[in-house]
């Protein structure tokens, strides 16, 4: 009789936050146990699991998973990993945590506590991360922080794609840059170009002034921005308002198009 092993209840709560994709469901392949110092069975503890201890290593396709101890549910192609958990995909993606439940059939990894995803110069920190190997997206839902070479971005909900290098932030978004702080409701961010796309009510605060906007983009490298939908730029006693504002924070110069007003 087949035994069905589902993710622990604490992991199911995030299912509704999963980002919908148009990708074909992943082809089912086997998870293999590569190494363990000891292997045992205990029907009183986990009747359907191989109990593994010491230098445990699994392989699933091109991904490797390491931990100190694990339960391996071979019948359902899944595993639970404990302590010093590490996932490696190629030589560019590394994910660490204290706990992992991995479903080899769906290729979804549920990592909990002290989770860190490293992808080149981008590092994601959270305590709850669900990582879908197909289509290669990690998402968090209890607060997270993404750090690159220039900015620190945090939010309550978020996701990051190691393939596209794009990050999405929702709810209590904050961007910390050496020259400014951005507060927003919804923000997309390209970790390569360092351009933030603003998609909700936002405030950008710097020594040179304050910007209020709900739509546009901000180039955090060149400190230039395009602000739409009657955005407002405040600098000293001056307030600039317009349908479209191209603003250079370094020079303090702004070009306004449509329904412009300047309060001095």
What does each model-found stretch correspond to?
Residues 1-264:
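N-terminal amphipathic/hydrophobic interface segments
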